[in-house]
Amino acid sequence: MNYIPTQTFYGRRWRPRPAYRPWRVPMQPAPPMVIPELQTPIVQAQQMQQLISAVSALTTKQNGKAPKKPKKKPQKAKAKKNEQQKKNENKKPPPKQKNPAKKKKPGKRERMCMKIENDCIFEVKLDGKVTGYACLVGDKVMKPAHVKGVIDNPDLAKLTYKKSSKYDLECAQIPVHMKSDASKYTHEKPEGHYNWHHGAVQYSGGRFTIPTGAGKPGDSGRPIFDNKGRVVAIVLGGANEGARTALSVVTWTKDMVTRYTPEGTEEWSAALMMCVLANVTFPCSEPACAPCCYEKQPEQTLRMLEDNVDRPGYYDLLEATMTCNNSARHRRSVTKHFNVYKATKPYLAYCADCGDGQFCYSPVAIEKIRDEASDGMIKIQVAAQIGINKGGTHEHNKIRYIAGHDMKEANRDSLQVHTSGVCAIRGTMGHFIVAYCPPGDELKVQFQDAESHTQACKVQYKHAPAPVGREKFTVRPHFGIEVPCTTYQLTTAPTEEEIDMHTPPDIPDITLLSQQSGNVKITAGGKTIRYNCTCGSGNVGTTSSDKTINSCKIAQCHAAVTNHDKWQYTSSFVPRADQLSRKGKVHVPFPLTNSTCRVPVARAPGVTYGKRELTVKLHPDHPTLLTYRSLGADPRPYEEWIDRYVERTIPVTEDGIEYRWGNNPPVRLWAQLTTEGKPHGWPHEIILYYYGLYPAATIAAVSAAGLAVVLSLLASCYMFATARRKCLTPYALTPGAVVPVTLGVLCCAPRAHAASFAESMAYLWDENQTLFWLELATPLAAIIILVCCLKNLLCCCKPLSFLVLVSLGTPVVKSYEHTATIPNVVGFPYKAHIERNGFSPMTLQLEVLGTSLEPTLNLEYITCEYKTVVPSPYIKCCGTSECRSMERPDYQCQVYTGVYPFMWGGAYCFCDTENTQLSEAYVDRSDVCKHDHAAAYKAHTAAMKATIRISYGNLNQTTTAFVNGEHTVTVGGSRFTFGPISTAWTPFDNKIVVYKNDVYNQDFPPYGSGQPGRFGDIQSRTVESKDLYANTALKLSRPSSGTVHVPYTQTPSGFKYWIKERGTSLNDKAPFGCVIKTNPVRAENCAVGNIPVSMDIPDTAFTRVIDAPAVTNLECQVAVCTHSSDFGGIATLTFKTDKPGKCAVHSHSNVATIQEAAVDIKTDGKITLHFSTASASPAFKVSVCSAKTTCMAACEPPKDHIVPYGASHNNQVFPDMSGTAMTWVQRVAGGLGGLTLAAVAVLILVTCVTMRR
């Protein structure tokens, strides 16, 4: 069956009741009775007219205003009525109480829901008891499947229901005649407050929550309404989370039914709980009358409670027997939570230090100290009972305690708790105290008793609360932020925590015996005394009156007070009455709950930005944590607690860093390529510029260039010298040879062996003018040839610029391209230019807005702090006892012989043979485990999900898709498939530990192999499962002589040790800038790898050429350019167009990234673009519609060393060369190359000439 109701059948909605009117509506007089046979048509018409007038008048008066009150007559009538009432009161007083408790009126939300619920919900009953509700929603009737019983409606009860275990619902079609009673439903659930039977329901973060106590078993099936009266969810149960309860609900989305079940949910079906008495079962809330009330039969009532202690309805039975099912008692809500304490009593217990360094049996002995609350509050359990007077009733300012065998009371104002100083007591109830204490190594509790004596007990206890947040403060701040924490909730209402109670032992008291003339007198004093005398025979028994044992001595008798009509706490310092584990249970007040704590925010540090580093000046008011990490592949995490003024220098790279100071939010910064010098200046400025960016590469390049220049000059000089020598050698060896004038000039030959230039040229002019002109043109021709060679060389070298080589290797999306690879970097835009015949080019932009890498987890176990349960020891007087087997974690049991325990009244045993003590202990989960535990997981393949913004044409839409190469999403008619990602990387190891909101890569022991004092010393599948494993090296020790106690040794909690030594979490050291989050465990925004994209874009997404503007004469002029800065370049494009419109803009090289994807074309023919580049001399091709041009710029370095955003361009892999630097290199290389080529040419020519001779 479809569990989504329809909205088709609505004849009416709920009709509000008529408004309440304090006045009485006058009734019309009844018409006289007329016999039908005697009525004439005229009379009938008159009667019909009267009837219509009466109905109209009645309707008008009901909807009209209140009638005016008469002035005299009603007052007299009222006065007479008051007088009559006074007379009646004097005669017979009313049985009502003087101050009856007013019934709480329902609020506006409750009234609204009650009106709607009158029609659409029906009770579900089992054996006459309401167990839940069924709701009419749309065209269906829905009932929770776990609610047992039959709907209290004959038409609905006989329907055939289809059950769904997935949704915990039973569903059937509504009968036709009831469809008008059904409620509408809606899947729209904006965050805010909704209504249900018990008031407001808060909806936030996909969860419905209510104040704890507003819902209870029996509310299953109740609907939750919005303000329009539409059903948004059906309640199934709830999970107690402290101050609030999370509801388990069935609700609807647009297309399907969903069920939300928070952890720890309990079904709210009011199932009938049964208890047993003498093999006869009865409802726990209605105990049998023999016994049924503690005040009438206390001892029998306690035995009945002990027989039912493990039954689910135990607390219903406890409440019923304490209140005796008297409804008048329930109205006293202030004392309701203290009713159970009348069945208990305080006790005296052994205390090793009673404040003066000596042991005693103290009425305020300290049993336990709990410090699980992260806000520093502690909970102390003592032997006295607070908030109860000696009569057993609630009295807030009293403390009742045991003094001997008597119950006494003292003022609560004298109660004090000390560590290194006085503690602030925040709450008290029964055996428990909650207080804020300063750090210390001991704890003492004391009070002034009724005789003004100080009763105290001191124990060794190290109180050093861990800081909440990242600052170790001592005083709650006026201003700060709220962070999650745990605290003890100051409520005395019943909780899920409980303590065991048992029947107290017989208390020996030698003062009950007195010697009188050879006889022993037992003075009962109104108590029941159990006595045992060895003189004579038959001197064993109990008595409630004074008794004399003849011919006996005190040393031969043993007397003890016995009282089994009250419970006392199962203390390890007090023996239990019998070996059987008979016990009762009572709730523990002040439960641990999740809360928020206000923590201070450290003063903002003074920050000085430097070149690729920042200096923070820190002024802590208290120890404050400083952490930082790199956002690259190597995070290099660092943390330090700082308690005084310091300065710290943090290195910053282009990959970015993240630092956090105290409770301030984390700050992310990135370095820019700032430097001194200019990339477009003189050679020394260019060298200084590159030295600031790439010092090692610059030194190597300048050294190599200098060496090349020196070598070139030396080689040229050597070649010229060699050529000169070869030219002059023949003339030097020939006697009388004359060196020609030209050769002499070129080779610097001595003038003595050659004619002058004028004489040589005059001779050639006279003898041969042709040779004259050739001789004159030879040097000129050589110069012209050399210049042409250098020019061609420079033209060939210019295209080999490094910048051009980089740009040539950049992939560009061509026409009909339907695949792409985008970088997995949040905020880094990827753009592709798509050209199709007959269509205007279109720019496709893909930008990753967020990624989530979620591993598949398998929960191995949870671990937390343990508590050691030590039941009261059983002492067998004059005999032996044996250990019993128990299925308890780390259960230990030992029997010690030869013990002679003493209590405050004397020896506990009186016999000639040895006594034995049975000591037991075992381990259980601490009560804090529900709030403070670590979960050990095995992590498997991680699934990546990305949120990507897709822009093309007029479409700009965000979509979420799995990056696996299979998941396809449709955006604006186009289909996109992302993945799989190029790098199969995850920050999570195979084994991880999740603790609160932190994740740790840790190799933990498998289930069942925990070691004492290590992580995993106790293990269980959940915080409530019965499969608890423990290995804590628990060992029992022999009790000290004369003392009742259960000593033991045990390894400290491995979980608490792990908390102190767990190190840095993955949240603070994950590489690639990953942000680790929990619920579910995931890594967000990890900048690693690339995402392949396959797309199918339909033709409808393109613009036809005839519809797009025709752009011609496109030219680009760069006005401002700052490289390595986020869109620090501004380019102005001028063009001509035939009409206005919209054109796609795209850069065809990854040298520059253009911010705009499309621009509006206007008739003025001018647009401005912003671009980002890492090159000092970028040259990139830009297209606007179908027109293209090349933009060339001379960029300057950025001025800001550190910026709070990452770069939006591709970084250069190798050092980039500016155009000016290339020009200087070309000039120097050209000059040196020309000189070297000239030397080579001269040497070759001379060599060739000399070889021909």
UniProtKB/Swiss-Prot annotation:
<keyword id="KW-1015">Disulfide bond</keyword>
<keyword id="KW-0407">Ion channel</keyword>
<keyword id="KW-0720">Serine protease</keyword>
<feature type="lipid moiety-binding region" description="S-stearoyl cysteine; by host">
    <location>
        <position position="717"/>
    </location>
</feature>
<feature type="topological domain" description="Extracellular">
    <location>
        <begin position="826"/>
        <end position="1227"/>
    </location>
</feature>
<feature type="disulfide bond">
    <location>
        <begin position="423"/>
        <end position="437"/>
    </location>
</feature>
<feature type="glycosylation site" description="N-linked (GlcNAc...) asparagine; by host">
    <location>
        <position position="1085"/>
    </location>
</feature>
<dbReference type="GO" id="GO:0003723">
    <property type="term" value="F:RNA binding"/>
</dbReference>
<keyword id="KW-1032">Host cell membrane</keyword>
<keyword id="KW-0945">Host-virus interaction</keyword>
<feature type="compositionally biased region" description="Basic residues">
    <location>
        <begin position="66"/>
        <end position="79"/>
    </location>
</feature>
<keyword id="KW-0946">Virion</keyword>
<dbReference type="GO" id="GO:0016020">
    <property type="term" value="C:membrane"/>
</dbReference>
<keyword id="KW-0165">Cleavage on pair of basic residues</keyword>
<dbReference type="InterPro" id="IPR042305">
    <property type="entry name" value="Alphavir_E2_B"/>
</dbReference>
<feature type="glycosylation site" description="N-linked (GlcNAc...) asparagine; by host">
    <location>
        <position position="279"/>
    </location>
</feature>
<feature type="region of interest" description="Interaction with host Mxra8 receptor">
    <location>
        <begin position="358"/>
        <end position="361"/>
    </location>
</feature>
<keyword id="KW-0812">Transmembrane</keyword>
<dbReference type="GO" id="GO:0039619">
    <property type="term" value="C:T=4 icosahedral viral capsid"/>
</dbReference>
<feature type="transmembrane region" description="Helical">
    <location>
        <begin position="793"/>
        <end position="813"/>
    </location>
</feature>
<keyword id="KW-1182">Viral ion channel</keyword>
<dbReference type="GO" id="GO:0006508">
    <property type="term" value="P:proteolysis"/>
</dbReference>
<feature type="site" description="Cleavage; by host signal peptidase">
    <location>
        <begin position="815"/>
        <end position="816"/>
    </location>
</feature>
<feature type="region of interest" description="Host transcription inhibition">
    <location>
        <begin position="43"/>
        <end position="77"/>
    </location>
</feature>
<feature type="region of interest" description="E1 fusion peptide loop">
    <location>
        <begin position="899"/>
        <end position="916"/>
    </location>
</feature>
<dbReference type="InterPro" id="IPR000930">
    <property type="entry name" value="Peptidase_S3"/>
</dbReference>
<feature type="disulfide bond">
    <location>
        <begin position="120"/>
        <end position="135"/>
    </location>
</feature>
<feature type="region of interest" description="Interaction with spike glycoprotein E2">
    <location>
        <begin position="162"/>
        <end position="167"/>
    </location>
</feature>
<feature type="transmembrane region" description="Helical">
    <location>
        <begin position="695"/>
        <end position="715"/>
    </location>
</feature>
<keyword id="KW-1160">Virus entry into host cell</keyword>
<dbReference type="InterPro" id="IPR043504">
    <property type="entry name" value="Peptidase_S1_PA_chymotrypsin"/>
</dbReference>
<feature type="topological domain" description="Extracellular">
    <location>
        <begin position="755"/>
        <end position="769"/>
    </location>
</feature>
<keyword id="KW-1048">Host nucleus</keyword>
<feature type="site" description="Cleavage; by host signal peptidase">
    <location>
        <begin position="754"/>
        <end position="755"/>
    </location>
</feature>
<keyword id="KW-0378">Hydrolase</keyword>
<feature type="region of interest" description="Dimerization of the capsid protein">
    <location>
        <begin position="190"/>
        <end position="200"/>
    </location>
</feature>
<dbReference type="GO" id="GO:0055036">
    <property type="term" value="C:virion membrane"/>
</dbReference>
<dbReference type="InterPro" id="IPR014756">
    <property type="entry name" value="Ig_E-set"/>
</dbReference>
<dbReference type="GO" id="GO:0005198">
    <property type="term" value="F:structural molecule activity"/>
</dbReference>
<feature type="glycosylation site" description="N-linked (GlcNAc...) asparagine; by host">
    <location>
        <position position="325"/>
    </location>
</feature>
<feature type="disulfide bond">
    <location>
        <begin position="275"/>
        <end position="284"/>
    </location>
</feature>
<feature type="region of interest" description="Ribosome-binding">
    <location>
        <begin position="106"/>
        <end position="120"/>
    </location>
</feature>
